[in-house]
Every structure is written in structure tokens, then in C-alpha cells.
């Protein structure tokens, strides 16, 4: 990955690419929505398929010369069906948000009702936030997690559904560290004759590997992104029963997108094949095991965790008890200076600004891809504690940063 052709044409971009390569090699990617793809996926996404316009679907294109585009997209679809057990799969969405958009376009009219989890409680912008198109086109009501336990309040969700009578109930979250009971949410949706969209963007890989229960076959629609825990490059995916297949396909194209990004679909195909290898199941289990070790280590250092722990790839830390004067954004900045990259995050009962909230969200998918095990994760938890306890100490931040570089050198990404 020396980008020799880029350097000949545009040294400034080549320098930025080289800098980003070095940054990824020398820092811990602990933003829960980030991961590292293989060199095979990188190569597929940088292939000549970027040149090909392929509006339509395999066998039904609007342009000639799509025989290899058809082959690649069909491989991606078939592999996705095998991974998740879905009847119908659309691999063309450019992102998880656009996958959600396709579902809304397929079954909702402007002004219809969405019931979803509040963003401060772990939801997502594309589930109805006022700043997002969903909050501007549809009527939105939101449910919450239980204030005492941090778990989804399923009873409150059912009551909200009965009172609000939504057209669609959205499950699946961006900052919820516990197992989701898809059947419980489906029952709430069924009781009010609503559709159920399960957004598994964060846990696509965990679901594929069987370390988290699957909503496929339970929810009417399942969406996800392909670059978090599945390691198939940037993009989105929609899964559904055959009865909704035509509506979903039309909502993706021509409803919300034009030509698909065939180079990204090639990356999806390659990443899905990698995920079908038995070694991926071991990886996904290690992601969860590492998150559990990290959670226990942080708790031992006195940190409060939303829900008291984790069942998946992320740990959500509420700093208000242990560090009441330290906003999550400031903690994240100090950790980034020490080469530990994560993000400030809102927490249930948020009292600060979303731009500098009360929590930090820590993910283990990226560091598990490096090969970190339980012992290393315990040390990472110790390092996070050192920095958060000493955000104003340049010496501590430097020392932790040096140790992080050593850990990265011991577990390189791309050799």
C-alpha cells in the first residue's frame, strides 16, 4: 500500500493516505463503529469496478457490459443469504442509514409514525432524530431504557406502542451494550399491526457468527452496515422476506439511489466470504469476550457502566459518578492524545451537551482484529483508566501513548 500511482499524480493526497495508514497502525481503533478490513477487501474496493455504471439489478441492468458486475453482486447476495439466513437481500445501499431509508420508503408515507429508541438511550439518528430526514418526514415517538437497569424497558415500549399506534417499530441501536430480545419487540409491533425494522448495523458480524440472537425471520426488515463487526468494507444491506422483496428493491433503486457502487459491493462480497470461514466465528466470540474483560477492568477501576456491563462489542461508560467534572468529549480527546481512539457519547439521563456528553463509548471489534486477547484487553482497560484519571498530565498521556505504540507494533494490522 505505497500508493505509488497516487504519489505520481497527487503527492498531497498520497501523503494523507500514508499518514492515515500510519495513524491506524499506531493507534487503537476503539470507536465501536470502526474496524479494519483485510487487504483483500481493500483491493476489491479499489478495483476497476469503480469505473462501471450498473443501474438496476443482476440480469436487469439499464446498461450493457454488466456481466462481471452481475457476477460480483450475485456472489455478495448469495453469501449474505448464507451468512444471515435471509430470504431476500439487497446489497446496494451505500450505508446503513440509506438501508433504513429504503425500508421507510418501501412501507411508509410522509407523516406516518415511527416508534424508536431515544438517541440519548442508545438509538440512532436515522431512527427519527429531528436533525435527520426521518424526524422531518415522519411523526416520531421514542421509547427508553430503564432508568435503573440500563436495559431496554420492554414494558414501556409496549405501552408506548399501544398509545402511539406506530406504523413501524425500530429496534437495533448504536450505543446499547446488551442482547436485544427481538421477539419481545416483534410482539409489541404485532399488537398494534406495525412493521418491525431491526437495525443490526453494529452487530451484523456478531449475528452472522451466532454470538448474538438474530432478528432475521423475526422482524419484517433487517438492515445493517457492512464495515463494523462484519469487516466487509463501507456500505449497507437490507434483508427481508420475499413478500417485501420488490418493494425494497424499488425503494433502493430508483427510489433512493442511482447506480450502485460496484467496487464497494465487491468489497462486501469478499468480506462476506471471509466471514463464512469458521475462523470468523472465533473472531466474533473474541470480540464479545474482550468487551467483557474490558468492562470488568473498568468497573474494577471505579467506572460506572450503563447496564452494568456488556453482551456485545461495546462498553458504555457513564463518567458522572467517577469523574463528575470530566465531560466525555474531553476524556476522548485525552485518550486520543495517548493513541486510544474512541468517542464521547450520550448516556441515559444525559445532562450535558451531545457535543461534549457525559459518557464514552468503547468498542473492541478493531483491537480484536489486531489479535488482542483477554490479557491485552485488561491492560488496555488499565491504560484507559490512567488517562481518564490524569487528563491534564502530559507525562501520563505520553507514557500511555508510548505503551500503546508498543502494543500496536506487537500486533500489526498490515504486514
UniProtKB/Swiss-Prot annotation:
Where does this protein reside within or beyond the cell?
Answer: Cytoplasm
- Which CDD domains does the UniProt entry name for this protein? SHMT
In Gene Ontology terms, what is one molecular function of this protein? pyridoxal phosphate binding
Kindly state which reaction or reactions the protein catalyses: (6R)-5,10-methylene-5,6,7,8-tetrahydrofolate + glycine + H2O = (6S)-5,6,7,8-tetrahydrofolate + L-serine
At which positions is (6S)-5,6,7,8-tetrahydrofolate bound? 119, 123-125, 353-355
According to its UniProt record, where is this protein mainly located?
cytoplasm
What's a GO cellular component annotated to this UniProt protein? cytoplasm
Enzyme Commission number(s):
2.1.2.1
Under Gene3D superfamilies, the record lists: Aspartate Aminotransferase, domain 1, Type I PLP-dependent aspartate aminotransferase-like (Major domain)
For the modification N6-(pyridoxal phosphate)lysine, the affected residues are 228
Cystine residue pairs: none
Pathway in which this enzyme or protein is active: One-carbon metabolism; tetrahydrofolate interconversion; Amino-acid biosynthesis; glycine biosynthesis; glycine from L-serine: step 1/1
Q: Which cofactor does it need?
A: pyridoxal 5'-phosphate
Mention one GO biological process in which this protein takes part, according to its record.
tetrahydrofolate interconversion
Q: Which UniProt keywords apply?
A: Amino-acid biosynthesis, Cytoplasm, One-carbon metabolism, Pyridoxal phosphate, Transferase
Q: What does this protein do?
A: Catalyzes the reversible interconversion of serine and glycine with tetrahydrofolate (THF) serving as the one-carbon carrier. Also exhibits THF-independent aldolase activity toward beta-hydroxyamino acids, producing glycine and aldehydes, via a retro-aldol mechanism.
Q: Which NCBIfam families match?
A: PRK00011.1
Q: What is this protein called?
A: Serine hydroxymethyltransferase
What is the organism of origin for this protein? Answer: Halorubrum lacusprofundi (strain ATCC 49239 / DSM 5036 / JCM 8891 / ACAM 34)
Name of encoding gene: glyA
